[in-house]
Every structure is written in C-alpha cells, then in structure tokens.
C-alpha cells in the first residue's frame, strides 16, 4: 500500500467516525428553551382575612409551547421562579430527554405573592401590606392559570418546600385540576413543632430589633442578616454534609464568616411576610379529597420535616395509592435543601410521570 493510498484510507476512516459521532449527538445542546417572562394582574384581590389589594401582580416564567400539557412548578420560601431554573433542579428536569422535557411540556413557574417580580411589601406598602398566607398564594396561582392564561387543567404540579406545602393545598382545594402531584420537602400536617418555632423566632428576631421600627426603616435592620443565617444553619444543609465541610473549628468559623460577609439582597418586611405566611398552614383536612396519584419526596436528613415522627406515613393513609420517597442521608445530601437537587430522584419522578393516566 502506497503512502498516498494509506492517507486516503485514514481520511475516509476519520470522515466515517466523524459522521457517526455527529449522528449520535443531538444537533442542539441538552438545554431547555429559554424562559419567557409574563405577568398576570388581578384588578382586585381579596385575601383570606377579608383584606383586599388592587392590581395584585403575579409574575411568572414559562418554558416550552402553550399547546403542550401544562406543568406548574412552585418554589420555596425566600426564592423566586429563577431558583427552579438552576442547574441542580431545572437543569436535571427540563432539558431534552429529561422527565419534564420542555419540548413536550409547557412549564409554568410563578413568583409567589411577596417575592421576585410579584407584588410584595417592599413595593411600597411595607408593614401595611395585607397579611397573606399559603391559601392566598394558591388562589392567586389558580386565578393566574384560569383567568390569565386560559388553562383549565394541569398534567402535574411539583413544588419544593413552601411549594411542596402549596402542592398539598392544591390537591385538596382543587381536586382533579392536575393529573398528578409531587410535593417535596414538606408535610401536609399543620405548621408546628421545631419547623414553626424556628420560623417564629426568625420573624420575632427582626420585629424585636429597634432598627426595624415597625417596618419603617431606612436601612435594613442588622438582625436580618443574623436571623437569616441562624435559620439556614439550623434548618438546612444536612448534618453529614456540614460535618464533611465544617468538621473542624477552623472550617466551621470560616463558613460562618463567609455567610456573614456575603451580600444580602433581602428586604426585612418582605422576609417577615414570607416566613409568617406559613403560620396557619394545614393541608391535612383536604387529604381525603385527593384522588390523583401522589409522589411525595422528602429526605431522611430534612431538619424541618424529620421522617422519624411518622407524620408523613400517617398522613398518606388518607391518600389512596400515594407513594413516599425518602432520600437517604449522606455527605452529598443537604438536609431540607436536598430536594433542590433533582439528581436524587430523577428516576422515580420519571417513572411516576410515565405512570400517570393517559389523557
């Protein structure tokens, strides 16, 4: 074989290999479509306590085509829609071939009342803002979907932490509106025990700071930063994970120093309303109304919803066919924050969605 023919043969092999490689790789990167922003405004919104507010705005982002089955995604406290687009959550769920592939589903992620670009106390009313709760937030979501977007049915509702609690409320308040429910990092039982005590202390530590001044401050009260970090360390992060990353005195001090030095963009009044809105949460009375499949996902190291209480097992007896996935604790999990990392339950979520009744 001549040198020329050898080179030609090598070139053909390279071309064939390249062709096969291109055929095996999608033409588009494995990323979901870019989010589209929108807002719905209620000319007049009445809250659970009779208070009203004109022009309540609920901001949202969507992924995918409106003609596809709709999925409602609900974020946690102190978050906004953007948190659900993170690489650990949305990056594991909304891309091509993933459980909630945005080329097959219409993903809707609202900012809850009081956060993000939705109407909130810091827009101007401060401490005179209506006292909203989770029921109000769910009502606003329902009206946004039905009145603002013309959506009368959902394929799935999936929510994390506060969003998980609101998913439970959705199931009992609007039974059958969604084909399936996936409440995560939550329990349907009333807000109580350490979960509420820590939230109450979080709110009180700011309200009792003279710098808060009944909500009429000109600079953020110093207590806001301290209260936020205390709450996060106490109710999030995971015992094994903290032992791995802060297992020495020096490492623990370094982590505290970093958190205290980090920029804080929160507003104290918004913060108080966000955490206080959970005070009267209790989805238990609506459990018997839930007739659709439920996949509840919690973690074994969840500081706010410890599985050893048996509360979830007892509650799920009220929901025929409900499944409970408890993610085992490890140095890789993050306590209450574990469910923000979808890699821990992608397989189970995929199976659950595939098993939903056909429509």
What is each PLM-predicted segment?
Residues 61-123, 311:
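N-terminal cap/lid subdomain of alpha/beta-hydrolase-fold enzymes
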Residues 270-286:
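Active-site nucleophile elbow and catalytic-triad environment of alpha/beta-hydrolase enzymes
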Residues 177-261:
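Alpha/beta-hydrolase-fold enzymes
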Residues 290, 296-298:
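Short beta-strand/loop motif that positions the catalytic acidic residue
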Residues 135-155:
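Conserved acidic catalytic loop of the alpha/beta-hydrolase fold
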Residues 153-192:
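Conserved hydrolase catalytic core segment
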């Amino acid at each position: 074989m001549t040198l020329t023919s050898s080179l030609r043969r090598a070139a053909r092999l390279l071309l064939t290999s390249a062709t096969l490689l291109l055929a095996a790789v999608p033409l588009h990167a494995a990323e979901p479509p870019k989010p589209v922003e929108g807002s719905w405004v209620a000319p007049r919104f009445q809250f659970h306590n009779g208070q009203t507010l004109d022009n309540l705005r609920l901001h949202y982002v969507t992924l995918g085509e409106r003609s596809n089955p709709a999925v409602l995604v609900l974020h946690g406290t102190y978050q906004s829609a953007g948190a659900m687009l993170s690489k650990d959550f949305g990056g594991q769920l909304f891309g091509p071939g993933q459980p909630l592939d945005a080329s097959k589903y219409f993903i809707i992620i609202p900012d809850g009342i009081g956060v993000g670009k939705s109407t909130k106390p810091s827009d101007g009313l401060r401490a005179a803002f209506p006292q909203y709760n989770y029921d109000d937030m769910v009502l606003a979501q329902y009206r946004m979907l039905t009145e603002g977007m013309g959506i009368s049915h959902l394929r799935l509702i999936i929510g994390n932490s506060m969003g998980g609690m609101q998913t439970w409320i959705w199931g009992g308040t609007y039974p059958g509106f969604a084909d399936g429910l996936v409440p995560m990092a939550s329990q349907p039982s009333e807000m109580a025990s350490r979960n509420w005590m820590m939230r109450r202390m979080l709110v009180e530590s700011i309200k009792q700071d003279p710098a808060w001044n009944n909500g009429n401050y000109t600079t953020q009260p110093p207590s806001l930063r301290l209260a936020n970090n205390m709450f996060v360390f106490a109710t999030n992060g995971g015992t094994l994970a903290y032992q791995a990353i802060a297992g020495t005195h020096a490492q623990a001090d370094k982590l505290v120093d970093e958190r205290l030095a980090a920029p804080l963009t929160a507003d104290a009044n918004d913060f108080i309303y966000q955490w206080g809105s959970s005070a009267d949460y209790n989805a238990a009375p609506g459990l018997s109304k839930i007739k659709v499949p439920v996949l509840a996902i919690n973690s074994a190291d969840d500081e706010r919803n410890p599985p050893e209480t048996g509360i979830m097992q007892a509650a799920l007896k009220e929901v025929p066919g409900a499944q409970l996935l408890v993610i085992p604790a490890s140095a890789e999990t993050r306590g209450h924050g574990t469910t923000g990392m979808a890699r821990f339950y992608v397989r189970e979520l995929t199976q659950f969605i595939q098993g939903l009744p056909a429509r």
